[in-house]
Amino acid sequence: MLIIRNKQDLKEAILEQKKANKTIGYVPTMGFLHEGHMTLVSHARKETDFVVMSVFVNPTQFGPNEDFDAYPRDEAHDAKLAEEGGVDILFVPTVEEIYPTELATKLHVIKRASVLDGADREGHFDGVVTVLTKLFHLVNPDNAYFGQKDAQQVAVVSGLVEDYFFPINLRIIATVREADGLAKSSRNVYLTEKERKEAPVIHEALQLGRELIESGETNEAKIVQVMTDKINEQPSHENIAYLALYSYPEFTPVTDWTKGIIIAAAVKYSKARLIDNELINVKRR
């Protein structure tokens, strides 16, 4: 595995693979890798000839009161897992490498970002599409791999790829979970012992919502209340940031219960904000 830190070296390495007619699979991450990330790598390994992973904690997608400085980082750990997983290039740029000067232009997400994380984290998705536009141009992948846990981000990135004609196939991979159902996340390390024991209730609540919808329930308020009551059975969380249903991938109010629906939750613990979701009537690509 080659570790690359600057743009020019990355572009030259990618060009060499392209000249050899190799297909490129790309896994963008913010590091502190876990089994969820490595599942994305496994899919990339099977479906493409050459796998690139980036580890970059992107400052533009963090709000002023969020955990950019405290976000867990461990490059040695990441490099070890990436190499063991079959990554060919690990791109680990500095902030200055990706943002060498103040931006002269700004990307702004218009659709799919006004609710849930878009409402709760102002400017978050603008930062996501900004950094991915840069990284997509640098890596020039055939396939890019994302996890379903970040379903709203996936919908936003799909819009970016469609709007700006990126020749990239987005591959959406099912959320990887702990044995007790908690979605794998780099932020899980922030949980106290009691919080970690209780956090799987998020997934349990979302499954209740799925069961209600699949049994024919269309009273949205009732569905949300049942899920809220379930989460509140475990009192260690500080608050429920959101618990809602929307059409997917549009993120508009549900009007047709036979089409794509997302049930999404964000729950705040003392030092961690955890997200999870269930997709209904949606085929992963």
UniProtKB/Swiss-Prot annotation:
Chain positions recorded as beta-alanine binding sites: 61
Active site per database record: 37 (proton donor)
Localization in the cell: Cytoplasm
CC terms in the record's Gene Ontology section: cytosol
Catalysed conversion reaction: (R)-pantoate + beta-alanine + ATP = (R)-pantothenate + AMP + diphosphate + H(+)
Keyword Lipid metabolism applies: no
GO biological process: pantothenate biosynthetic process
Gene Ontology molecular function, alphabetical: ATP binding; pantoate-beta-alanine ligase activity
EC class: ligase
Major localisation: cytoplasm
Assigned EC number: 6.3.2.1
Pathway(s) this gene product operates in, as recorded in its UniProt entry: Cofactor biosynthesis; (R)-pantothenate biosynthesis; (R)-pantothenate from (R)-pantoate and beta-alanine: step 1/1
Keywords: ATP-binding, Cytoplasm, Ligase, Nucleotide-binding, Pantothenate biosynthesis
Family stated for the protein in its record: Belongs to the pantothenate synthetase family.
PANTHER family the UniProt entry points to: CYTIDYLATE KINASE/PANTOATE-BETA-ALANINE LIGASE, PANTOATE--BETA-ALANINE LIGASE
Subunit structure: Homodimer.
Annotated protein name in UniProt: Pantothenate synthetase
Upper lineage: Bacteria, Bacillati, Bacillota, Bacilli, Bacillales
